[in-house]
């Protein structure tokens, strides 16, 4: 067994900026690597969130830009779509900027699951109300259809979130 000196490599020098090896090309981590999860936007969960946000935005724009007389029904639809869009964007940013590592007091998979359960139920109700009150106006019908599409995408997120939560919990219990 040898207790001799070994080579220790670090990404930053302990001396000045012009210390030993300052001119050499050393592989270093980018400053955004710790802050941003650059692989997250390519995951299925992120693409699903983007699809949800796009369909919710289209549904909101369709209803907002068309003429309607039943203010309570479509105001409810607008509020639900925008609130759902904002919450999905918030969860997207939490995963993109890795806020879940900083805010460990929150169970992020559980909070995302609860958000999707409540948001999907409210979105389904809003889409049904919007479809029943559309009066054959094309913008309102399109908004209701995109609302149902967003509901389907949110159901897919519930399944994915539930699957991740249960698999994570069951493997933790087995260990």
From Swiss-Prot:
In this chain the MARVEL domain maps to: 40-166
Listed GO biological process terms: B-1a B cell differentiation; chemotaxis
Species source reads Homo sapiens
Q: What is its main location?
A: membrane
Q: How does it sit in the membrane?
A: Multi-pass membrane protein
Cell compartment(s), UniProt: Membrane
Looking at the UniProt entry, the stretches that span the membrane are 43-63, 77-97, 110-130, 140-160
GN (gene name): CMTM7
Question: Which of UniProt's keywords are assigned here?
Answer: Chemotaxis, Cytokine, Membrane, Transmembrane, Transmembrane helix
Q: In which tissues is it expressed?
A: Highly expressed in leukocytes.
- What InterPro entries does this protein map onto? Marvel, MARVEL-CKLF_proteins
Family designation: Belongs to the chemokine-like factor family.
Give the GO molecular function terms: cytokine activity
This protein's GO CC annotations: extracellular space; membrane
What is the recorded name of this protein? Answer: CKLF-like MARVEL transmembrane domain-containing protein 7
